[in-house]
Swiss-Prot record:
UniProt record similarity statement: Belongs to the LysR transcriptional regulatory family.
Keyword set includes Cell membrane: no
Disulphide linkage map: none
Protein name: HTH-type transcriptional regulator ArgP
Assembly and oligomerization: Homodimer.
Organism: Vibrio parahaemolyticus serotype O3:K6 (strain RIMD 2210633)
HTH lysR-type domain boundaries: 4-60
Purpose: Controls the transcription of genes involved in arginine and lysine metabolism.
Entry's Gene Ontology molecular function annotations: DNA binding; DNA-binding transcription factor activity
DNA-binding region: 21-40
């Protein structure tokens, strides 16, 4: 019986990564019909679909598992083949990692910079909410993920990184305009806030747990950029919860003030990655864990 042909999965990976059959064909230097035929052969072999044919195409649950397998095999090939062939001209290894926006805006890039300088690696850092990134590792879409989840998924491990402390801040003018009578459920209901996106539960938790304010009762901007949070707060447009690590200078200079001293939202974060790692991925995991445990509150 014929086994699984990795050219079939290569075609699936190209379609998903490139976003269309046409671009996948260009990427692999084959015809579009060849791409379509390989995916049909894969689906026939498995007796189930691997691709949701919409725009852009998306993998089915079994397709995601195959992509995870394929990317792990590719990573192992990249580490082993140059040694076997004594070849130093191998293309950089491509690695996809899932991170939350606040880690990317504060400590993650300094943690990775030495590996990026010394190893041939192309990183794709994709931002997801802290509770969603682990799903990308489960599906095989990424090789590692920063998550709030402490429990490791099968065949992976979870290393504790540290704590991210969030403070609720605004500029002095904004504070006087909206909170001159104090920060309470009445004044919070009138003051515009900003959060990352509809999946951002941090601000909702802050309002309900500390002030018994329904999140849907406040003016709430969504901006998918941690850096824009800071700009909006500095401009006096909104108040926000933001990592203390990101605004150390602004708090010291007084351009931002902690409007709820005594209330601190903290999350423990973890690095989830494959148990059996080699080469550059192992170095990346070590760099992330070592840097975070040195620089984040523990």
């Amino acid at each position: 019986m014929r086994g699984l042909d990795y050219k079939w999965i290569e075609a699936l990976d190209a379609v998903v990564y490139q976003g269309s059959f046409e671009r996948a064909a260009e990427h692999l230097f084959v015809s579009q019909s060849a791409i379509s035929q390989r995916i049909k052969q894969l689906e026939k072999f498995l007796a189930q679909p691997v691709l949701i044919r919409e725009q852009p195409p998306k993998p089915t649950p079994i397709g995601k598992k195959l992509l995870g397998l394929y990317r792990r095999v590719r990573l192992l090939e990249h580490e082993i083949l140059p040694e076997i062939k004594n070849d130093t001209t191998t293309r950089p290894v491509q690695l996809s990692l899932a991170t939350n926006a606040d880690s990317l805006a504060t400590w993650l890039l300094p943690a990775l910079q030495d590996v990026m300088k010394t190893r041939q690696v192309e990183l794709k850092l994709t931002i997801y909410g802290e509770s969603r990134s682990i799903e990308k590792l489960k599906s095989g879409e990424v090789a590692g993920a920063i998550s709030l989840e402490s429990q490791a998924i099968p065949n992976c491990r979870a290393d504790y990184l540290g704590r991210i402390d969030y403070v609720c801040v605004a500029n002095p003018e904004f504070y006087q305009r909206y909170f001159s009578e104090g920060v309470n459920n009445q004044t919070l209901a009138k003051a515009p806030a900003v959060s990352y996106d509809q999946y951002d539960d941090l601000h909702k938790k802050f309002l309900t747990e500390h002030f018994n304010v329904r999140p849907d009762s406040v003016i709430h901007h969504n901006i998918s950029s941690s850096e824009a949070f800071l700009k909006m707060a500095l401009a006096g447009v909104a108040y926000c919860l933001i990592p203390r690590l990101q605004i150390t200078d602004e708090l010291e200079q007084g351009s931002l003030i902690d409007i709820t001293p005594g209330f601190l939202m903290s999350y423990r974060i973890y690095w989830h990655h494959w148990q059996l790692e080699t080469g550059v991925l192992q170095e990346i995991s070590q760099a992330i864990v070592n840097y975070a445990q040195r620089h984040l509150p523990q």
